[in-house]
Amino acid sequence: LVYKIIKLEYDENRIVITGYSIGSGIASYLAATNHPKMLILQAPYYNLVDLMQQKMPFVPTFILKYKLENNRYLKSCHCPIYLFHGKEDTIIPFQSSQKLQKECNTVSQLILLDDLGHNGMNENFMYQSEIEKILNDRRI
């Protein structure tokens, strides 16, 4: 609903979708079902079932109402995709982003951040520098 409202005010070629951690699933879905300028994912998981099996194997995955399959959504994206992940992330390992990049059917870039865990990415100097460069290069 929010994306539809934003589209009333802005052309999609000016909209950047971003999602952090669990929010990467919603962001990927929005990018796959719309035409934003780009998609930026921070510490994304491969898909929610995969994440649950890694972190909580004792919980049956059929209880998930929403599967939130980043791996599936990224195949349908038509915009550039930027994946950021901390190398020290113990909640969602950076290998998740490496697997996701292989699913992208469009221009994608994986930026691994040294000495960064799952939290604090927005405050990380390297992340800020890379985001500034990406936004300037894409004229946002």
Model-derived regions, located:
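Catalytic histidine-centered segment of alpha/beta-hydrolase-like enzymes
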Residues: 91, 116-128
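Alpha/beta-hydrolase fold nucleophile elbow
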Residues: 10-21
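Short alpha-helix in the alpha/beta-hydrolase fold that links the catalytic acid
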Residues: 70, 79, 93-102, 127
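Short beta-strand/loop motif that positions the catalytic acidic residue
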Residues: 76-78, 82-89
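Alpha/beta-hydrolase active-site loop
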Residues: 1-9, 72
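Hydrolase active-site cap/lid region
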Residues: 24-79, 125
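Catalytic histidine neighborhood in serine/cysteine hydrolases
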Residues: 98-119
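Catalytic active-site module of serine/aspartate enzymes centered on a nucleophile-bearing elbow/loop
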Residues: 124-140
